[in-house]
Amino acid sequence: MRVRKRKGAEEHLANHPQYVILEPEAAKGKWHQIFGNDNPIHIEVGSGKGAFITGMAQQNPDINYIGIDIQLSVLSYALDKVLASGVENVKLLRVDGSALTNYFEDGEVDMMYLNFSDPWPKSRHEKRRLTYKTFLDTYKQILPKNGEIHLKTDNRGFFEYSLTSFSQYGMILNKVWLDLHASDYEGNVMTEYERKFSEKGQAIYRVEAQFKD
C-alpha cells in the first residue's frame, strides 16, 4: 500500500514505544517478555493501515499480534487505529519482511498472515513476491513445526502463483477459497484493500497453507 508521506509520522511512532518497537533487533527472542504474557504470537507482514491487525486483536484478546510494514507513513496510520481501538495486544514493527530472522528466533512466531501483498506481476520481479521460495525459507524458520500461513489477495495470478509455490515447497493446502465473501467462512476481518475491492464485487481469494516437518 503506497500512501503520501505523512508529516510527523516518525515522531508519532517514536512517541508511542508501548506499541511501536523502536529497536527491533533487540526484541529477538524476547517477544513474550515484551507482551508480558505467554500467549501465541501472530504476525502480519505488510500490515498496511492496520485494519486487519487491529480487528484481529479485538476479536482475539488472548493472542498477541505484530503488524509489520516498512513504510513509515503507513505504519503511523496503523498506530492511529491501534490507539483508537484501545487494544493492548498489538505491537508494530517497521522492518523489511525479507529479514524476519533478524527480529524473531526460530519458532518464536505461531502464525503469520499475508494480506494483499504486492503481486509483482512481471517475471523479472518474481523473487520479490512474498511467497517466493526464499521468503518461505524465512517463514519456516520463525514458525513452529507445522506452522501456518494464511493468505488473502484479490489478484488471481498471484494467488495461483502462491498455491503453486506453497505446493512445490512441500506445504499442505489445508483450505482454499476462490470467493471468500460468497463462502460460509466466519470471523473474517477485512483489510482496507479488501473492503475496497469487495465493494466493487471483486472476488477475494484465501488459502491456509501449512509447513510440513
Swiss-Prot record:
Residues binding S-adenosyl-L-methionine are 44, 69, 96, 118
Q: Which InterPro entries match?
A: SAM-dependent_MTases_sf (IPR029063), tRNA_(Gua-N-7)_MeTrfase_Trmb (IPR003358), tRNA_methyltr_TrmB_bact (IPR055361)
Does the record's keyword annotation contain S-adenosyl-L-methionine?
Answer: yes
Catalysed reactions listed for this entry:
guanosine(46) in tRNA + S-adenosyl-L-methionine = N(7)-methylguanosine(46) in tRNA + S-adenosyl-L-homocysteine
List the GO terms this entry assigns under cellular component, sorted alphabetically: tRNA methyltransferase complex
Q: In which pathway does it act?
A: tRNA modification; N(7)-methylguanine-tRNA biosynthesis
- Entry keyword annotation includes Plastid: no
Q: What's a Pfam family this protein contains?
A: Methyltransf_4
Superkingdom of this protein's organism: Bacteria
Binding positions (substrate) = 122, 154, 191-194
Q: What is its EC number?
A: 2.1.1.33
| Family (UniProt) | Belongs to the class I-like SAM-binding methyltransferase superfamily. TrmB family.
List the protein's name: tRNA (guanine-N(7)-)-methyltransferase
Identify the species of origin. Answer: Streptococcus thermophilus (strain ATCC BAA-250 / LMG 18311)
Q: Which gene encodes it?
A: trmB
